[in-house]
Amino acid sequence: NSLVKLAGGSIMLTLFLVMIASLVLGMGAPTTANYVITSTIAAPAILTLLAPNTPMELVPLVTVMSAHFFVFYFGIIADITPPVALAAFAASGISGGDPIKTGVHSAKLAIAAFIIPYMIVLQPALLMVDVTILQIVWVTISAVIGMIGIGAGIIGYWYRKLMWFERIILIAAGLSMIYPETISDIIGLVVLAIMFAIQFIGNKKENGPKAIA
């Protein structure tokens, strides 16, 4: 309730605060303890917002699953999130790299993973519970394409190196495909298709056969 009040009833802000709480609670905790802690402390905030004034036994299964998936997922991602980042520290011990830099790069490369839990809450059809095959196919395709756009925008490379404004466009288009509205999915798909064509053609021109003088 405190998190929901602090977020002013905003679903996105509530999810963001729950994400921070889950990352902190999950740092250094083994898997089972991680789930017990995050599901007990953080998940109720999401359920309070998604199913207000509803007894737990009457809350739809998919709503409960999405809330618990959200907190558990971020609890696990804490292993690659600085400053603790146990997995990154273990990897740096093997490679001989700097632990903090390894943690930062691991979080950067896995940026798409930080978006997936939001998609699960906003588009519960991804859990494949009480939905049609068509719904599953549609949300899965939009999720995958959206992740490609966001990932390329964050990394700064697709078929070739991206300009700063191209990165912003790709990230915005990818995020629009996460929002559970058909029109936003279509807009995002069209923008990403145009960006793909520009990248593909530009890369072909840059790497095409050179004229012999």
Q: Where are the language model's segments positioned?
A:
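Alpha-helical transmembrane segments of multi-pass membrane transport proteins
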Residues: 1-213
